[in-house]
Each structure stands twice: as structure tokens, then as C-alpha cells.
Amino acid sequence: MDRVELCNAILFGELDVARRLLDSYINPNFTINGYSPIKMAVRLRDVEMIKLLMSYNTYPDYNYPDIESELHEAVEEGDVVKVEELLDSGKFINDVIYKKGNTPLHLATISKNLDMMRLLIARGADTDVPNTDRFTPLHLAVMSKDIKGIELLLDHRACTNIEDCYGCTPLIIAMSKGDTEVCRMLLDSGANIDYFSKRPCVTAMCYAIQNNKIDMVSMFLKRGADSNIVFTVMNEEHTTLEMICNMDTNPESESVDMLIADIALRQYTNTISSDKGFSRNMTVINSKSRLKDVFEKCKIELRRINSESIRTYNILDLCLKPSKNLDENILARHSRKILGLYDNAIFYKYLLKELADTASQRAEAIESAMRVIDEKITGDETKWNWLPHEIKYNILEYIGNKELDIASMK
């Protein structure tokens, strides 16, 4: 009876009813009068129903072992003209009745055929249809580090938070491959940095800390990953720190120290999102002498950073609120102070890095250009070398880094 009800829900486009039935563990891989649920959805060209069914372990090729499709085969062959002709003749562009449940867009992504991907998307291919393994085209592009393909899919609003059959989002896949560039692209396009996958029971941050991927942890923290967020696993609540300490992980890794540093930072700046999460984290920290020592050292380092100011802004505030960042010339004039804090920082280098890079690059560009100009202008026709150092510096502050570099090379 439930099977008939599912078929009726598909027939009438009742997504909520179909989802309720699938949640009650109905196996969608059956046929009635030669039609499986997925074949019905494809026949009706109901893309949302197709996506729903494919996300519940549907195998479109299970009952059709000798399946063939002119459209899919033309895509595999890279035959753009034939694909256009088939689409013009009415072939369904989001058809999953093929090997492994792949749509034409999946196949174009697998072969990294960017022109074919563009064509299919322009003709209405949905970027978020999962295949049998629940891989969307974005999952596949991330797996193969196809930067151009990833950019194309993200430009067309491919969803960044869909789980595959292993419970992994594209962000978790990119993180597991150590691919900082792709992680950045996904985060820029809206990937949820705190997305909790129930199947592997991890977030991207948890995975990064577990594998001590320092660059990833640094980027996630800078992007706002929440160290005090509470997740529910098997009806039990956990924070990232609790999960890490429950895994086969070295609790003395640099990545764990960075997590502790973020917990201390959120307390210091009064930006705790969850009192419950913070309380649970502090219970763990206070139970381990080394973690407690790290936490106390973090507070000392934060006080030191917060005690230093540039004009009316303390440096910690400048690091935390980029909108308040000062003009790069002002930062350059205080580069020694900023670089001194950066060099002496143990736990908060990731926080100071952008400020330190901006200050040092600008200061070096001005000083380097001044040295070159001083050496090249030896006569007194311009009176350049008569000017005090401060006046020269003020003049060069009006010139951008790129132009200063060009001037230095001439």
C-alpha cells in the first residue's frame, strides 16, 4: 500500500508526502506495471521529485541493466551538435535513467568538458541533481579539482551543502584533499562552514583538526567557524572540542591549540554564540592540564595584542573588524609595531596575518622605491635629494604599490 501511495505522490507532485514515505524507509527501487518511482518522475519531468528520490538511495539502472540513452552517449562522445539536435527534439536534459544515475551534466563534468557543461546549463540542466552515489556535479568537480568546472557550477548557484552517500559536502571533500583554494571558492559561494554531517559525524573544521591541517583550520577560524557550536549525535550533544577529544586524535596538536585559542578569543571579545557550548568546552579544557595551560597563555597573548593601538583603534579590533581597517599608508607607518606583534604571537598569527601582510608590503614598496629613486636621481636638477626623508615618504604615499614597483624597475 505504501508503494502505491508513493507512486500517487509522484504522480500528483506531492513532495512532502513522498518525503514522509521515504523517511519511513520505503525502498524506492521497485516497479509497478514496468514503472519504477524514478522512471515515473523522469517521465513527468519533475526535477524536484527526481532530486528527492535520488537523495534516498534510488538506483535508476537497477531494473534496466541494458539501459541506453542517445543524449547521454552524445555527451560522453563530446558531440555538441548532436546534443543540440537531441535537446531540440525534446530529449529530457535532467534524465537520470542511465548508468549510475548520471545526468548528462554529470557526464560532462566527469570528462571535464567545459563547453558541454556550459551548453547543458544554458539549456536548463539542473546543477543539483544527485546520481546513485548522491554525487552532484559539484561533488564530482571538487573531487577532480576541476577549477573551471567548479567556477562554472558555482556561478550558476550549485548548492554547496548537499551530502553525498558518505555524508560529505563538497567542502568536506575539498578539505579532505587539502585543497585550500577550492575550500575558499566554496565558502565564498555560501558553503556553511559549520555544516554538520550526521553520517561521518563531522564538520569540515572537525575533520581539519583531526588531520592537523593547520592552514585549513586557520582559514576556517578566520571565516567564522564557531568553536562553541553544539551538535547532536545519537541523541547526545557534543562540541567540536569534545568530538576531537573522543576521537583517536592527538589532543596536543597545533590544530587543537588553534581551537582553544578561538574559544579564548570568543570569551575575551564577548562573542560566545552558545553558553552551553562554551561551558562544555571549558569543562574539557579544565580537565586537561595542557589545554588549560594553552587557554591561559591565549588570554595573556590577547591582552598584549589588545593593549597596542594605532591612532584610536586597538590592533585586536582592527583584526576582528576588517571594515575598520585603516589606510594602508597608516598601517605601513606602524609596520614595526604590527610585525613585532605578529612575530611574537604564538596562537593568533592567523588573526594578525592580513594586517601584517598589508603593512609590511606597503612599507617595503615605499622604501624600495625611495632607494631606487635616490640612486638614480644623482643630479640636482629635480632637487629630489634635497628633500627630507619624511617629505619623500609623503610623496610616495600617493602612489600605489603597482606603480611603485614599476618605478623601482625602471
UniProtKB/Swiss-Prot annotation:
Start and stop residues of the ANK repeats: 33-62, 66-95, 100-129, 133-162, 166-195, 200-229
Pfam family, one: PRANC
Family annotation (InterPro entries): Ankyrin_rpt (IPR002110), Ankyrin_rpt-contain_sf (IPR036770), PRANC_domain (IPR018272)
Keywords: ANK repeat, Early protein, Repeat
Cited SUPFAM superfamilies: Ankyrin repeat (SSF48403)
Disulphide-bridged cysteine pairs: none
Name of this protein: Putative ankyrin repeat protein FPV240
